C-alpha cells in the first residue's frame, strides 16, 4: 500500500468527506481532502529535510492523509477514532504490521487534547497539521460572525514553511492582514495552543 493508493482509496475518501461535512455543520474550518493532502506533503517535507529514510517519509504521508478520518465518527476523540478506522482499513492491504502500527499510532497521537509526539513520524504529523493556516479554510462567509479561529485563518494571506536543518528549527512565516486580525489577537490565540510548541522534541 502506497501513499498514491491511499489517496484513491474509496473508504478513506468517504470518511474524509463525511468528517468534513460533520465539522462544517458544527462551524469548524475546512478539513477536506485539501487539508489532508497538505498535511501529508508538509509532514513528508519535514522528515525529508532532516534526512529520514524514504520508508518513514512514505508512512508519514499515509498517516497525514488519513489523520482526520475520525471526524466522521465524532470531533471529540477524533484522533483515537481515526486510529481505529485506519487500522481497519490498512488491515485489508499488503502493508506490513509494523508499518500499520506506526501509522495508527501517529494518527492516534496527533490531537492536542489527548496526544503528543513519541517519535519522528508523530512529531512531523503534529507540526504539519498545526501549520495549515490559510484563508481558504474558512467556510463562514459573513465576517461579522467569525469566531477567533475563523479570524486567525482568514487573516493569513500567505504562508511559508521554513526548515533550518543546521539549527534544527522549523518555523512558519505568515503574512497577516491586520484589518482582519491584529497581531496581538493572532498571537494570543496561538498562545492558547501551547501543544504546538511541544512536538518538535520528537524529531531527534
For the regions a protein language model found, what residue spans apply to each?
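Post-HEXXH active-site segment of zinc metalloproteases
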Residues: 77-87, 97-98
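Histidine/acidic-rich helix-loop-helix segments that form or flank divalent-metal centers
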Residues: 96-158
Amino acid at each position: 500500500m502506497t501513499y498514491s493508493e491511499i489517496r484513491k482509496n474509496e473508504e478513506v475518501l468517504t470518511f474524509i468527506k463525511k468528517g468534513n461535512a460533520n465539522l462544517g455543520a458544527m462551524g469548524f474550518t475546512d478539513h477536506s481532502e485539501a487539508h489532508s493532502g497538505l498535511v501529508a506533503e508538509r509532514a513528508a517535507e519535514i522528515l525529508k529535510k532532516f534526512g529520514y529514510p524514504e520508508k518513514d517519509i512514505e508512512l508519514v504521508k499515509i498517516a497525514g492523509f488519513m489523520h482526520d478520518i475520525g471526524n466522521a465518527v465524532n470531533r471529540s476523540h477524533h484522533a483515537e477514532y481515526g486510529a481505529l478506522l485506519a487500522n481497519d482499513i490498512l488491515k485489508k492491504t499488503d502493508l506490513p504490521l509494523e508499518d500499520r502500527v506506526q501509522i495508527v499510532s501517529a494518527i492516534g497521537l496527533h490531537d492536542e487534547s489527548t496526544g503528543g509526539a513519541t517519535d519522528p513520524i508523530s512529531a512531523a504529523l503534529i507540526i504539519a497539521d498545526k501549520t495549515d493556516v490559510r484563508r481558504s479554510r474558512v467556510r463562514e462567509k459573513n465576517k461579522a460572525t467569525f469566531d477567533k479561529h475563523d479570524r486567525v485563518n482568514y487573516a493569513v494571506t500567505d504562508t511559508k514553511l521554513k526548515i533550518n536543518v543546521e539549527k534544527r528549527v522549523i518555523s512558519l512565516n505568515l503574512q497577516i492582514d491586520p484589518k482582519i486580525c491584529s497581531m496581538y489577537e493572532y498571537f494570543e490565540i496561538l498562545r492558547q495552543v501551547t501543544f504546538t510548541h511541544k512536538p518538535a522534541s520528537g524529531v531527534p
